[in-house]
């Protein structure tokens, strides 16, 4: 995949359901609906609303505690399962060969689904917590993911919060190359070099918290406000466009229908190379995730 100065320009993105192709040929809508920190009592309605708005790519995780509600929201929407792309994630306490297999089935049961379109390892096991066992634990977990992929329970397998060195280490023993890596990407925490490295490894990068997340000052940033005014767009739409033009797949989250709709409306303008550089140079606007090499949960 080749990227020019403005980012991923070889594909014409028309709307949130323009398809990207993973390295195994599976197609994925270019924008997803995120459900991080969406409570169980809100998630059902929010997911149904998101599907009504037009989202076909839904992202959840076991640790979010809302898979059952997400599943009900999908059922409430009443559309064909094949029209949806559903992702969930394996939580850290379930790493390991047998526990990974059980965790997938538990997620499927909670969601009320027969298969997942994408299943991710939520975080890499690290040496700080597991010492020399970290590499073995990641390899065993991935072996279970590969087997479940071969069994047809998952259409694509990938990673979350893995940095390039984690991916390279995993690939030393992997039979199947990961298709996706979902990491924190937003103005103020751009991960520019990491994105380029992951893309060079033929992974599709997804962006969680593309609008900055809880406690971030991204949406109040003066530079972003000026760029947004120039394009007659909101700061959120500028952030999503900036992510998209890097060839990265954004996962915006809102439980409000008006904002869900706003987060789909960023396909009718393009950021200039200078604007892309300005945004990528922003720093210290709020980071959500701890260093994956330092976490101990």
Predicted regions and their residues:
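Short catalytic-loop micro-motif centered on adjacent basic/acidic residues
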Residues: 56-64, 87, 155-158, 180-183
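A short, structured active-site edge motif that brings together acidic residues
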Residues: 81-94, 118-124, 184-185
């Amino acid at each position: 995949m080749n990227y020019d100065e403005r980012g991923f320009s070889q594909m014409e993105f028309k709307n949130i359901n323009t398809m990207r192709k993973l390295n195994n040929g599976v197609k994925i809508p270019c924008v997803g609906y995120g459900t991080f920190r969406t409570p169980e009592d809100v998630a059902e309605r929010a997911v149904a609303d998101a599907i009504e708005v037009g989202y076909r790519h839904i992202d959840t995780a076991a640790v979010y505690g809302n898979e059952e509600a997400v599943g009900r929201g999908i059922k409430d929407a009443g559309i064909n399962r094949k029209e949806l792309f559903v992702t969930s994630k394996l939580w850290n306490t379930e790493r390991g060969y047998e526990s990974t297999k059980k965790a997938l089935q538990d997620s499927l049961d909670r969601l009320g689904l027969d298969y997942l379109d994408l299943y991710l390892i939520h975080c890499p096991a690290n040496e700080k917590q597991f010492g020399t066992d970290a590499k073995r634990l990641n390899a065993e977990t991935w072996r279970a993911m590969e087997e479940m992929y071969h069994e047809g329970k998952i259409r694509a397998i990938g990673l979350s919060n893995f940095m390039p060195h984690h991916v390279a280490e995993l690939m030393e023993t992997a039979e199947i190359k990961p298709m996706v890596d979902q990491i924190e990407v937003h103005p103020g925490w751009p991960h520019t070099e990491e994105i380029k490295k992951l893309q060079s490894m033929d992974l599709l990068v997804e962006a969680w918290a593309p609008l900055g997340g809880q406690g971030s000052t991204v949406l109040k940033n003066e530079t972003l406000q000026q760029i947004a005014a120039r394009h007659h767009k909101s700061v959120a739409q500028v952030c999503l466009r900036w992510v998209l033009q890097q060839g990265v797949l954004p996962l915006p989250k809102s439980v409000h229908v008006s904002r869900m709709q706003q987060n789909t409306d960023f396909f009718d303008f393009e950021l200039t190379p200078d604007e892309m550089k300005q945004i990528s140079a922003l720093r210290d606007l709020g980071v959500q995730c701890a260093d994956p090499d330092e976490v101990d949960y």
